[in-house]
Each structure stands twice: as C-alpha cells, then as structure tokens.
Amino acid sequence: MIEIEKVCVDFTAGRGTSTRAVDDVSLHIAAGEIFGIVGTSGAGKSTLLRTLNALTRPSQGRVNVNGVEISALDGKALRQARQRIGIIFQHFNLMHTRTVAQNVAFSLKAAGWERSKIAPRVAEILTLVGLADKANRFPVQLSGGQKQRVGIARAIANHPDVLLCDEPTSALDLETSATILALLRQINAQLGITIVLITHEMNVIKSICDRVAVMSGGKVVESGEVFDVFAHPQHAFTQQLVSHTLNLTLPERLREHLPGQLLKILFIGDSAEQPVLSEVAIKFGVAVNILHGKIEYIGERALGILVVQLTAPHNPTAVAAAVEHIRQRTAQVEVIRG
C-alpha cells in the first residue's frame, strides 16, 4: 500500500545552511492497517506524514502509494492521486462561514462530483460520523470533538484509500479523544481505509494502532507490532516513552532505602493471570511487597508489569531461588536493585 524508501527531507535555513528533518526513513505500511508514528516535537513525524501526499517533497528517496510514486507526480496527476488520500488536522481547519454540510460538500465539489450526488453523500457521511443532526450548524456552534468529526467526514467523503491523521486528538480532552479514536477504528474496520496517524502520545498508539514507528531526531529508531514495542522496547528512547506511558518509575527514595531485592516483572498473555507471586511467597517463604504495577490490554493481549520487593532476612538464598522461579514463569525479570 505505502512504501517509504530511504526518504530524507532537508530544509534550507539562512546563509545556505540546511536542517535534515527526516533522515533515511524506510517503512512499509500495509493496506487496511492503522499505522502510528510517534515521537516528541521536532522528531520529524509531521514532515514525514506530509511526504505521503506530496505536501512536502523528499530531498532524497521515494514515496509510493498504491503502486504510484507520488513523490514524482505534479499537476493533474498529483491532484488525482491526492483525491485518494484524505487528511485530518490537529486544529480542524474548517471553513467557519460554512455549515457542517457545506464543509463536507466542499471537498466533493473540489473533486468534481456531480451536483445531484453530493447531498446524498454528505448525508451518508454525516450519519457515519454521528453528526446527522448538526448538518446546518456552523463550526462556532460545535464542540472540539464535533469539529474534528466534521474534519473526518470531509476527509473520507471522497472514498479515499488512505487517511492521514496529524495529531488528531492533541487539542481534545481525554474523554473526547477516546471517542475520536473509536470513530477512527470504526472507519478503518467498516470502510477498510488505511490510516496513518502521528502523535506524541504512546497512549494513542496503544489505543488504536496495529503497528508503530518510533521517531527521534528525524530517524525511525524502532518499529513493529504495538504489543511487541510495549512489551520489549529495544531503543533507549522507546523505553523512556513506554516507561512514562505505563508510569512505572519509582521514587529515588524507595530505590535507595527499601531492603531486599527490587524487581520489575513483565507478564504476557496467560502469565498475567497466574498467581506467580503467591507461589513464591508460599514455596520459598519470602515476603513479597508490590510497590507499583498494572495490567494493560493492548488489542486483546494482556501485558502486566509489576515492581516488587522481595525480602527473606533469615534465609538469603530464598530470594535468589524465588527470583529464578519468577524468571521461569514470566516473560521477563529485571533486577532494579539487588
């Protein structure tokens, strides 16, 4: 569906100097998936997204969408290719002097739809996004979530194959963000549209995406299935993002002053539902103190992470035996302090 091959994007600054915003990025995005690109501000993710509809041209490399090198198109051919690629923005970009229905109809008129087919299509798409009763409202009369729904309706009205989402929830509160993400998931499942979404929030990635690429300094430092990236982050930057998202950082005071061994334990799938800690407490006579932890469900797979303290003042070897038992029953054990 989308092939990004060794793409670099350079921006010229003053006095002939240039800045590399995207640095040698290669990605394959399959048809029908929801693919996330995550990174902090300045990571290059928005610039990379804009190469997918040629709003930004690569300085090097190629971008192919549906077998067509969109980075090489211009004129009429580019306009036709862009009709198959919808885009929604962080700040909605609605026309404030036009109604909801007129905002959606505008994209169809621009694409050359027959006049008689525009109104039925607008009604159909507003029903899909839950705004059938808001067709004659103006943007100023809408909430932030409703404005983003108009943006989504406008972006998918022309039956695109691809929907680009540029930080679609960053201007919304948590509850509204969840409803927008649920709508995007529904659109993906119902219409089969490939979605490419950029965000700085790993929670958004966890909620909606099938696969993810992590960007830092213009490079993709890690990519893979969302569950695998959360369960086994390889790059230091990804580890930092995941740790922050799961909120598993212990206060330094606890790390320094608690006796015994401190472990971070990863449970995957069925192991997240097994009484492993109860087993070691009974079998080895160690005291188990859970300091921090949670179980997340990514897709339909369980991912549990616990930070625990193990102590056995009168039997030092029991702790080592307990740790070994935990290693055999769980996906991963990290000794934070031993």
Curated annotation (Swiss-Prot):
Location of the protein in the cell: Cell inner membrane
Residues engaged in binding ATP: 39-46
GO terms for MF: ABC-type D-methionine transporter activity; ATP binding; ATP hydrolysis activity
Gene Ontology CC, one term: plasma membrane
Signal peptide coordinates: none
Record key words, sorted: Amino-acid transport, ATP-binding, Cell inner membrane, Cell membrane, Membrane, Nucleotide-binding, Translocase, Transport
EC number assigned by the record: 7.4.2.11
Membrane topology (UniProt): Peripheral membrane protein
Disulphide bonds in the chain: none
Catalytic activity: L-methionine(out) + ATP + H2O = L-methionine(in) + ADP + phosphate + H(+); D-methionine(out) + ATP + H2O = D-methionine(in) + ADP + phosphate + H(+)
Residues covered by the ABC transporter domain: 2-242
Cited Pfam families: ABC_tran, NIL
Record function comment: Part of the ABC transporter complex MetNIQ involved in methionine import. Responsible for energy coupling to the transport system.
Protein family according to the UniProt entry: Belongs to the ABC transporter superfamily. Methionine importer (TC 3.A.1.24) family.
Assembly information from the UniProt record: The complex is composed of two ATP-binding proteins (MetN), two transmembrane proteins (MetI) and a solute-binding protein (MetQ).
Protein name as it appears in the record: Methionine import ATP-binding protein MetN 2
Provenance organism: Salmonella choleraesuis (strain SC-B67)
